[in-house]
């Protein structure tokens, strides 16, 4: 009798565990850190947007500037990507919605000129300078920055890796 009760409890526990695991498998779409609030898209072009989801899941992407809906299916590794046409440059904040059954919307997106700067140590210096070596006029530049809300900045951190990185901890 105890053995039967034990087996029923074990079966119930396994079913409960499987149910909780299936809820976890219904993961919400995850975006690359560059695809985030306040991002800037290169104007009048095609922009690549990408992220991850449950393998086989369909991701629908819609934008506030177009009626078009672009879709992608997550690959075996969960990765997906789409290309969307971008509007003319402007300072009107835009939105992009990603829908895999659960919506994720990024806000404050601008369409404009995107400049990528790269280099060595000269590109590592923060706007305020290094400790004990401030940049002349830094305080005035910070105060004046409030007048340029359309200028966005994203710093991709330097990391050493023996293999290509899939994401970078970056915010606009």
Where are these regions (language model features)?
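Sec-dependent signal peptide recognition
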Residues: 10-15
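Cell-envelope and extracellular/periplasmic
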Residues: 28-172
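Short, Lys/Arg-enriched N-terminal segments with co-localized hydrophobic residues
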Residues: 1-8
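Hydrophobic h-region of N-terminal signal peptides that target proteins for export
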Residues: 17-25
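Intrinsically disordered, low-complexity sequence elements enriched in Ser/Thr/Gly/Pro
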Residues: 8-9, 26-28
């Amino acid at each position: 009798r105890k053995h039967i009760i034990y087996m029923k409890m074990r079966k119930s526990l396994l079913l409960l565990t499987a149910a909780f695991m299936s809820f976890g498998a219904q993961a919400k779409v995850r975006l690359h850190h560059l695809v985030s609030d306040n991002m800037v898209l290169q104007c009048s072009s095609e922009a690549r947007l990408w992220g991850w989801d449950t393998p086989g899941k369909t991701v629908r992407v819609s934008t506030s500037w177009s009626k078009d809906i672009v879709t992608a299916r997550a690959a075996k590794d969960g990765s997906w990507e789409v290309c969307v046409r971008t509007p003319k440059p402007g300072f009107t904040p835009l939105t992009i919605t990603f829908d895999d059954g659960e919506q994720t919307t990024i806000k404050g997106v601008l369409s404009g000129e995107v400049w990528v700067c790269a280099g060595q140590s000269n590109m590592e210096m923060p706007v305020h300078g290094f400790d004990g070596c401030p940049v002349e006029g830094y305080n005035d530049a910070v105060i004046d920055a409030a007048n340029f809300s359309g200028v966005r900045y994203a710093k991709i951190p330097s990391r050493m890796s023996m293999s290509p990185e899939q994401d970078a901890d970056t915010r606009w």
